[in-house]
Regions:
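Phosphate-binding loop/pocket of nucleotide- and phosphate-handling active sites
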Residues: 343-410
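Structural signature of hydrophobic alpha-helical transmembrane segments
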Residues: 416-428, 449, 474, 478
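Adenosine-phosphate binding glycine-rich loop
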Residues: 112-114, 118-156, 161, 282, ...
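Glycine-rich phosphate/diphosphate-binding loop of Rossmann-like nucleotide-binding domains
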Residues: 6-44, 151-241, 409-411
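A structured beta-alpha segment of the ubiquitous adenosine-cofactor-binding alpha/beta core
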Residues: 54-62, 71, 217-248, 252-265, ...
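An N-terminal-biased, well-structured beta-alpha scaffold segment characteristic
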Residues: 5-100
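ADP-ribose/adenylate-binding Rossmann-like module
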Residues: 81-112, 247-306
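Small-residue-rich segments of transmembrane alpha-helices in multi-pass membrane proteins
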Residues: 453-463
């Protein structure tokens, strides 16, 4: 079976559906790959690189399976009967294309119709592209912004950090929060789902909650329209933040519907001159009033509104690699025997949800898939408290007295040469107990390095005793070497793992 990789005819599309790395992975599944000449040129993948990876440079329309980024509307007539077309077909917003595909004896799978379930995460193109878009949105904002993101104290004065507001904490929003925070900005984020608050805080952002009485949970994995009460409360929050922040990044999208308006023209008018807004929903109408899809607009009060619709395509090499990997994961699912034979199983909810047309038969829309329905709250059962017997702690003075008496008796019975060692040993125990007991728990792992050195001394001392005494001395020396060696090697292993947490691979 042959897989063909199309070159997108749109001059603004720089991505490609396969890279040399993914071509090698497809070959391991038993497929032959044909790449259209120049398909990866805009993403820095030459035809020679594809050929070295095992692909053939030729006509992809004669292949059994055709990979594409966007639907090849002008080339559908050239697809052979029985061809399987796989790409971002956007069936929710392109009913005309769906009808056109259904009139042809082909099978069409849409990569942007993958259900939001954990088993399908490796195929989720929307998440892959949203991750790139969120990162690129911060890069575009930094390019248009006239100041540092991070605060600085210099000889010329103090530079305040930039304040960034991210509307929506989905995949794109979280990527934007992480990128802006890594540049040193003060990041705030809003989202109608209160459960994402911990994710925002884990990336160093501040979660701004919209206090509303009717926050609902979507059962599809995608955003949903909110109530008028929520929208009114959110509008007041956005209005307050617009006067304060320097950069706003909006990510709110509702599948199959125009993007909701979050930032009005009045809010934009209150923003400071030089502020930047990146509207990531510009392709669907925009979250910001005044956004022009594909263009940059500067308002009368000096606010820059960026409405780029190709943010993932502005990182073409990375976007192509992630998209190609999503396709490879799909082919692994469709090729269970790794024999180069595509098997489409409609009993699999993932494959069923992606299939728009099967052998010329319309299969869109698929049955709904519930992926995140909130479980019903269970009333807590009353638990009868059973009294636990209280153990009286030992008297510290009694314990100290017994220990002192035992030490005194041991010292009195010991040889004179041993008394000094016992005294030092007892003092070391007391001092070590109080020193280690007051060390913060987070520093216990670094203390392993110190204990390695102490255990090493024990090993050396035990080695010196081997062969210089009776069987008892030799036996105790062997036990000491064994136990101390476990501490030494274990300590170094833990220390290595600890240091690896602070290094970049």
């Amino acid at each position: 079976v042959i897989i063909g990789v199309l070159r997108d005819p749109d001059p603004g599309e720089r991505r490609v559906a396969a890279t040399p790395a993914t071509v090698e992975q497809l070959a391991k599944l038993g497929y032959q790959v044909v790449v259209e000449p120049g398909a990866g040129a805009e993403a820095s993948f030459s035809d020679e690189a594809y050929a070295q990876a095992g692909a053939t440079i030729g006509d992809p329309l004669t292949a059994d399976i055709v990979f594409t980024i966007n639907p090849p509307v002008q080339r559908l007539d050239k697809l052979a009967e029985g061809t399987t077309l796989i790409g971002m077909l956007n069936p929710r917003l392109a009913p005309g294309l769906v009808e056109d595909l259904a009139r042809r004896p082909i099978t069409a799978l849409s990569m942007d119709a993958v259900p939001r379930i954990s088993r399908a995460q490796s195929l989720d193109v929307l998440s892959s592209m949203a991750n790139i878009a969120g990162y690129r949105a911060v890069v575009e904002a930094a390019h248009a912004f006239g100041r540092f993101f991070t605060g600085q104290v210099t000889a010329a004065g103090k530079v305040p950090p930039a304040k960034v507001l991210v509307a929506g904490a989905g995949v794109a929003g979280l990527a934007a929060i992480g990128a802006a925070g890594s540049l040193g900005a003060i990041v705030r984020a809003t989202d109608p789902r209160p459960e994402v608050a911990d994710q925002v805080r884990s990336l160093g952002g501040e979660y701004l909650a919209v206090e509303a009485a009717d926050v609902e949970v979507s059962a599809t994995g995608y955003a949903k329209e909110m109530s008028d009460d929520y929208n009114d409360r959110a509008a007041r929050l956005y209005a307050d933040q617009a006067r304060e922040v320097d950069i706003v990044i909006t990510t709110a999208l509702i599948p199959g519907r125009p993007a909701p308006t979050l930032i009005t023209a009045d809010m934009v008018a209150t923003m400071k001159a030089g502020s930047v807004i990146v509207d990531m929903a510009a392709a669907n109408g925009g979250n910001v009033e005044g956004t022009v899809a594909g263009e940059v607009v500067v308002t009368a009060n000096g606010v820059t509104i960026i409405g780029y619709t190709d943010l993932p395509g502005r990182l073409p090499a990375q976007a192509s690699q992630l998209y190609g990997t999503n396709l490879v994961n799909l082919m692994k699912l469709l090729t269970p025997d790794k024999d180069g034979q595509l098997v489409l199983d409609f009993d699999d909810v993932v494959q069923r949800s992606m299939t728009v047309v099967r052998d010329g038969e319309l299969t869109w829309p698929p049955p709904p898939v519930s992926v995140s329905a909130a479980p019903a709250a269970v009333a807590p059962q009353p638990v009868e408290a059973t009294p636990k017997p209280v153990r009286r702690p030992l008297n510290p003075l009694l314990v100290t007295g017994v220990a002192a008496a035992a030490l005194f008796l041991l010292t009195a019975a010991a040889p004179a040469a041993l008394r000094g060692h016992l005294t030092v040993f007892a003092l070391a125990i007391v001092i070590g107990y109080y020193v280690i007991g007051h060390v913060h728990h987070a520093l216990h792992t670094p203390l392993m390095s110190v204990t390695n050195a102490i255990s090493g001394i024990i090993v050396v001392g035990a080695l010196l005793q081997l062969g210089h005494g009776g069987g008892l001395v030799t036996g105790l020396s062997v036990v000491a070497i064994l136990l101390a060696s476990i501490n030494v090697f274990g300590g170094f292993a833990v220390t290595r793992r600890m240091l690896a947490m602070f290094s970049r691979s």
